[in-house]
Regions:
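A conditional alpha-helix N-cap/helix-loop micro-motif detector
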Residues: 32, 100-104, 131
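Short, charged beta->alpha transition segments
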Residues: 80-84, 105-112
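Generic beta-sheet signal
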Residues: 97, 123, 151-154
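A cross-family acyltransferase "interaction/gating" segment
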Residues: 135-194
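Catalytic core of membrane glycerolipid acyltransferases/transacylases, capturing the structured
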Residues: 48-101, 161
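Catalytic-site beta-strand/loop segments enriched in glycine and acidic/polar residues
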Residues: 109-141, 145, 203
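Membrane-anchoring hydrophobic helices of lipid-metabolizing enzymes
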Residues: 1-67, 84-85, 175, 198, ...
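Residue-level detector of anion-binding/catalytic polar loops
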Residues: 93, 119, 148
Length: 209
């Protein structure tokens, strides 16, 4: 009996604490934004996009979203429900699924939503990793919806490791940056395995698909 009570208490309290912590960190550190002009141009034209960032950088990302009506892919595992409730406080909605649980259904739902005219948010390496190695889902999603992939990265001069998923970066007393990378170009040929660089915010493609 005690365990269910603690679980309910966790789901009730942690999202509010998480939301407040992210907001506080956002106000207390100097976060600058780089490379957002193409994103703002897309938004000004009423166009939608797929925002992609590494799983370990997810903690501060709700503060980076510049549009409205985004759906975020969140795992059904472990802390997924907590993340779902935290991002809901930022006005973001979620689709639940991962490569090991509900992935096919989640991909279908994301395709449907992307075609209906909303932004999509995905971590292409996922909670299970391998870290900073993009899986095929983001490429399949872009090809099926016609939406451009917009790479996003977060970096800070000092950071602690916070257990929000797999080691999210949690800045403390630091200078930080949200950096948007150039959109990768996808050909119409059957995609091979995407080979993204691990190097920070650039997300350069090193092989064609």
């Amino acid at each position: 009996m005690l365990k269910p009570l603690l679980s309910r208490a966790k789901l009730s309290c942690v999202p509010a604490i998480g939301y407040g912590t992210i907001r506080l960190l956002g106000h207390s550190i100097g976060i600058r934004v780089e490379g957002a002009q193409p994103v703002d141009a897309l938004l000004a034209q009423g166009k939608r996009m797929i925002i992609a960032f590494w799983h370990a950088q997810q903690l501060m990302m709700p503060l980076a979203y510049r549009g409205s009506g985004a759906y975020v892919l969140i795992s059904r595992h472990g802390d997924g429900e907590l993340i779902h409730r935290i991002i809901a406080r930022f006005g973001l909605q979620s689709v639940r699924g991962s490569s090991t649980r509900g992935g096919t259904e989640a991909l279908r739902e994301l395709i449907r939503l992307g075609r209906s005219g909303v932004d999509l948010v995905i971590t292409p390496d996922g909670p299970k990793g391998p870290r900073q190695v993009a899986k095929m889902g983001v490429v399949q999603l872009a090809k099926a919806t016609g939406l451009p992939i917009v790479p996003l990265a977060f970096g800070c001069s000092k950071k602690n490791s916070s257990r929000a998923g797999t080691g999210s970066s949690c800045p403390t007393r630091s200078r930080a940056v949200f950096s948007y990378g150039a959109r990768p170009s996808l050909s119409r040929r059957r995609p091979g395995h995407p080979n993204w660089s691990r190097n920070g915010s650039s997300w350069r493609r090193r092989s064609t698909v």
